[in-house]
């Protein structure tokens, strides 16, 4: 099983980059210390997504960072990514594991305790859980699950849980106190005019996680 060796999990959305090149924004975040990126550009055609994934792979390699691909196991394999991130109702993690093997990471998005338990049973390496706080990017998932549900989930499962949704500096300590291994976020870095400095500020509040732990 691959090791979850990061505490800040950056998820991309080029539509929130304010017209800037996504690779340039992510490069800034990597320069600021981000060590895991999920490429999540669901509206791109497969060929365009593959080209972007390969470019993102070269970029993350420069910084010794991990790259996960949202949903697309085929793109992850073709781009040489470190794994995939699956939706709660998408491909079962067990099926993805058969295709990817034991050496790649599998994350699963969960929006409730039942989904979290199912992800563990399917062999996920980690989950994102949320939205914990209000956020426009996750409005489709309804009302925030709240900090109490996050705390209950971290007590019930044995894999790392990343708090997702409305994450900012002010609420990171609360999420960590609830048992989160780290935080996952999009706009806090992608939409920031200085992704490097924003990444540094966020990482200063998070526990270090290394591959040598």
Swiss-Prot record:
Broad class of enzyme this protein falls into: transferase
Binding-site list for 4-amino-2-methyl-5-(diphosphooxymethyl)pyrimidine: 38-42, 70, 109, 138
Superkingdom of source: Bacteria
Alphabetized InterPro entries for the sequence: Aldolase_TIM, ThiamineP_synth_sf, ThiamineP_synth_TenI, TMP_synthase
Single GO cellular component term: cytoplasm
Keyword Metal-binding: yes
Cofactor note: Binds 1 Mg(2+) ion per subunit.
Reported cofactor(s): Mg(2+)
Listed GO MF terms: magnesium ion binding; thiamine-phosphate diphosphorylase activity
Pathway the protein acts in: Cofactor biosynthesis; thiamine diphosphate biosynthesis; thiamine phosphate from 4-amino-2-methyl-5-diphosphomethylpyrimidine and 4-methyl-5-(2-phosphoethyl)-thiazole: step 1/1
Entry's Gene Ontology BP terms: thiamine biosynthetic process; thiamine diphosphate biosynthetic process
Binding site for Mg(2+): 71
Catalytic activity: 2-[(2R,5Z)-2-carboxy-4-methylthiazol-5(2H)-ylidene]ethyl phosphate + 4-amino-2-methyl-5-(diphosphooxymethyl)pyrimidine + 2 H(+) = thiamine phosphate + CO2 + diphosphate; 2-(2-carboxy-4-methylthiazol-5-yl)ethyl phosphate + 4-amino-2-methyl-5-(diphosphooxymethyl)pyrimidine + 2 H(+) = thiamine phosphate + CO2 + diphosphate; 4-methyl-5-(2-phosphooxyethyl)-thiazole + 4-amino-2-methyl-5-(diphosphooxymethyl)pyrimidine + H(+) = thiamine phosphate + diphosphate
Residues that bind 2-[(2R,5Z)-2-carboxy-4-methylthiazol-5(2H)-ylidene]ethyl phosphate: 135-137, 166, 186-187
Transmembrane helix among keywords: no
NCBIfam families (alphabetical): thiE
Function: Condenses 4-methyl-5-(beta-hydroxyethyl)thiazole monophosphate (THZ-P) and 2-methyl-4-amino-5-hydroxymethyl pyrimidine pyrophosphate (HMP-PP) to form thiamine monophosphate (TMP).
Protein name (database record): Putative thiamine-phosphate synthase
Organism: Geobacter sulfurreducens (strain ATCC 51573 / DSM 12127 / PCA)
């Amino acid at each position: 099983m691959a090791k979850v060796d990061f505490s800040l999990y950056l998820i991309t959305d080029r539509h929130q980059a304010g017209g800037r090149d996504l690779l340039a924004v992510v490069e800034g975040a990597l320069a600021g210390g981000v060590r895991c990126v999920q490429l999540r550009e669901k509206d791109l055609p497969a060929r365009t997504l593959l080209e972007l994934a390969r470019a993102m792979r070269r970029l993350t390699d420069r910084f010794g960072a991990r790259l996960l691909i949202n949903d697309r196991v085929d793109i992850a394999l073709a781009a040489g990514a470190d794994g995939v991130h699956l939706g709660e109702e998408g491909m079962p993690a067990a099926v993805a594991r058969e295709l990817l093997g034991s050496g790649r990471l599998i994350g699963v998005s969960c929006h409730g305790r039942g989904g979290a338990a199912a992800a563990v049973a399917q062999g996920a390496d980690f989950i994102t859980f949320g939205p914990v706080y209000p956020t426009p990017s996750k409005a489709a998932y309804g009302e925030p699950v709240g900090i109490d549900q996050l705390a209950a989930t971290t007590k019930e499962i044995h894999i790392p849980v990343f708090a997702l949704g409305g994450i900012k500096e002010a609420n990171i300590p609360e999420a960590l106190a609830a048992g989160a291994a780290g935080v996952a976020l999009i706009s806090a870095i992608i939409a920031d005019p200085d992704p490097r400095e924003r990444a540094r500020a966020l990482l200063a509040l998070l526990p270090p996680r290394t591959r040598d732990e």
